[in-house]
Amino acid sequence: MSQQIGFIGLGIMGSPMAGHLARAGYQVVGYDLVAASLAKLEAAGGRRASSIAETVEGSSIVITMLPADPHVEAVVLGEDGVFEHIKPGTLFIDFSSIKPGTSQKVAKAGTAKGVRVLDAPVSGGEKGAIDAVLSIMVGGDAADFEAARPIFDLVGKTSALCGGHGAGQAVKAANQLVVGGTYALVAEAIVLMEALGVDAAAGLDMLAGGLAGSRILELKRASMLARDFKPGFRIDLHHKDMGTVLDAARQADVSLPLSLQVAALIQAARAQGLGNLDHSALLAVIENLNGLNGKGQ
């Protein structure tokens, strides 16, 4: 009989990740509040659960992929949560992007119960999850990382143990400040080129092929030019992540002036009602600052 994995959180990222594991032959038991997400898992060969307890029961590996710190604390540490039902020796992997301190709190609680805990936030967005090419930043013990490597190899392209508990979240925070900054600069480049009457599509092709090239330019330049901001990763979630960045900077007593600017732009996006759009919608914020209505108009 194949190994059973309990997977809690089948949203934009969790759904394709759980599907990869089910198609690889794992017995995946999934739990989510959205019925359509459970149906997707069943279509991939998994099984739906009706509660956290049912998801955890019989699972030698338990995975969570949740939006933010309060969700992780409630689902994992709360009443009738994961740690009330999990057995000693179980490998617990949290793919959520949360504060390092929250991951350390989860690890402390899990260790007290004999649970092997890893924080393993990911980068790559919805497309990365669908294509199983995520970058996975891991915090925890080396032996537990090696035990989880087969899982990481099925849902991602690269994974690395970055340090002890919470280290994965620290690296994810750094990732998010780079991603947010890159989106903001690409947005400004588009606005500048269009204001100067340049063929912005040709211009971005040139940027993508030179030193300014990035994964964001590779994957997002066409949709940004089309002002297609269908969410792969929502502004609201990036706002949460920038809060993590700034909290970490205060704790480390370091100055990150550009991160403050990026956080302000993301907050402006939310104030303009763009929170449910993709983080590439920072382009709309830059256009609004310049009195434009898309494509330099």
Where are the regions that the model predicts?
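Rossmann-fold dinucleotide-binding core
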Residues: 5, 10, 97-180
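Active-site-proximal catalytic alpha-helix in oxidoreductases
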Residues: 131-132, 136-139, 160, 164-196, ...
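Interdomain hinge/lid region at the active-site interface
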Residues: 165, 213-279, 297
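Rossmann-fold NAD(P) dinucleotide-binding segment
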Residues: 52-64, 68-116
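Beta-strand segments within the central parallel beta-sheet cores of soluble alpha/beta enzyme folds
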Residues: 151, 201-208, 260-264
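NAD(P)+-binding Rossmann beta1-loop-alpha1 motif at the extreme N-terminus of oxidoreductases
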Residues: 1-65, 90, 95, 126
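Hydrophobic beta-strand scaffold residues
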Residues: 28, 48, 116-118, 159, ...
